[in-house]
Amino acid sequence: MKLLDAIKTYADAKPQAEAFRSLDHSLTYGELWDLSERVASGIQKHTADGSKAPVLVYGHMEPNMIVSFLGSVKAGRPYIPVDVSIPAERIVKIIESSGAELLISVSGDAVDTGSNLIKTVTPEELAADGDADLSRENWVKELDTFYIIYTSGSTGNPKGVQISADNLQSFTDWICRDFPVGEGKTFLNQAPFSFDLSVMDIFPSLQTGGTLHCVTKDKINKPKVLFEELEKSKLNVWTSTPSFVQMCLMDPGFTQELLPEAEVFMFCGEALPAAVAQELLNRFPKARVFNTYGPTETTVAVTSVEITQQIIDENESLPVGFAKPDMDIFIMDENGNKLPDGEKGEIIIAGPSVSKGYLGEPSLTEKAFFPIDGQWAYHTGDAGYVQDGQIFCQGRLDFQIKLHGYRMELEEIEVHVRQSQYVRTAVVIPYQPNGPVEYLIAAIVPEKHDFEKEFQLTSAIKKELAASLPAYMIPRKFIYQDHIQMTANGKIDRKRIGEEVLV
C-alpha cells in the first residue's frame, strides 16, 4: 500500500523526524515504524491464527493510538478507534457488532466492557511480545477493510462504516495532490480519532513526511492553554470543524501573528458559515481557506472549493465545491430520477471513495448503498443542488420541518440569523412538545451591542430577518448564550442545545 510504503521511506530516510507531537508527547518516524512492527507481531500472537477480526484501539489522541492503528493494519486487521469519551455501554455494542477479539488500551484507563468476549492489552505489552521482522504480505491492502468508524444509527445502535485500503488511498492521494499540503508540513489534529475528520490530517501528514500536532480535549476546554500551545505549534495546515475555528475566532488574538506559518485552513464535518470564512480571510491574509464535504460513508470528504472573497460576495450560503476527480456526484428526486442543474433533491455520491457498507448490517447497507452506472453509490440523506458543476449542500433532508403547513429548512433559517450584524453564531431549534412543531427557537451568541434590554436586541434581529425571510420562518423565541455547545467531535451539539433551551 502506497501510504505504508511512504511511512517506511520516511522512517528509513529521516528516522529522527517528528511524526507526532503534542504538549505531552513526541514520536519520530523511526519509532513509529519500529513500534508498529512490534505491535503488529504482538497482535498476531494474541489472536487466533488466520483471524481478520477488527482490533479496538481505546484512548484519546495519544501517539500510541497511531502506532496501534498501523500495527493493526500491518497485522492484516482493520482497526476501530474508540475515544475515552465514548460510554462503556456503547463500547460493548461496538464489540458485539464488530466481532473484535482484541482491545488495545492506550490511555491506561480500565475499560469496563462487562464482557469476556474480548482480550484487553496495552500497546507496550504487544510490543514486548512482538518482533520487528514481519512480512508485508500480511498488510491490509486493496479491498481489505483498513478502518471501521462507528456512527449513530437510527435504531439506537451504532453502525460500523467500513473503509477499505483503496478507499483511504484514493482520499489521501487526493488531499496530497489537490491541496497545498506539500512535504514536511505541520498538520493540526483537533478531532478525536473516533471521528473521521481526523483521517484528513493523520494520513496526509504521514504520507508526506509531515508532523501531526495534536490538541487534546483538555487543552481545547482551556482557551488560554490552547492559544499558548497554538503559538508554539508552527502549524502550516489547519484541519477542523467550522465550529472549532469559530470558537477560536471569538478571541481577537486568533490571527496570523499567533500562527505566522499557517498556510491553509481545511474544513469538513458541518456547514462553513460565510461569516467565519470572511473573518479567516481578514485575519489570515497569507493563508488559503478550503471548504470540503462528505459523509463518513464516502471516506471523509469528496468535494472541495477554495473560498475566495469573490465566492463569499456571490453566495449567501457557501458551496461545498467540485467533486473529487474520480467521483460522480448528482442529485436525485424521491423516485430515483436524476435532476438537472439547479433543481434540489438528495445528494448521491458514487465512485471509489464509497464504503463497502456497514459491518454485519446487510439490510442497512442495502438501504443506503446501491450500484449505479457501474459504480457503487451512497444515499447521503443530504439535500442539495448542482450549479455549473459546483455542489451546494442545504442540510439534512431530515432537518426539514413543517410549521403551520409550511415546509422549511432549519439550516436555511440559521444562515439568515447568522448574517445579522448582532449575531456571532446561532442555532435554530424546533419546539414540538406534542409532535407537531409549534414554533422555532433561536439560540444565539450575540455580538457586542449597545442595547440595554434583551427584547431590544431581539427586535433589532427580527427587523433584519424580516427583510430576507417570510414571517413564518422567523423564530418566535430568542435565547442568548455566551457560547454554543459542541460535541466531543467539535460539531454543534444540537441535541444538548435543544435540551437546554427547551427546559
Swiss-Prot record:
Which residues participate in ATP binding? T151, S152, N291, T292, Y293, G294, P295, T296, D382, K491
GO BP terms: lipoteichoic acid biosynthetic process
Keyword terms of this UniProt record? ATP-binding, Cytoplasm, Ligase, Nucleotide-binding
Keyword Cytoplasm listed? The answer is yes
- The disulfide bridges present are none
Q: Which residues bind D-alanine?
A: D196, V300, K491
* Protein name as annotated: D-alanine--D-alanyl carrier protein ligase
* Higher taxonomy: Bacteria, Bacillati, Bacillota, Bacilli, Bacillales
Q: Which gene encodes it?
A: dltA
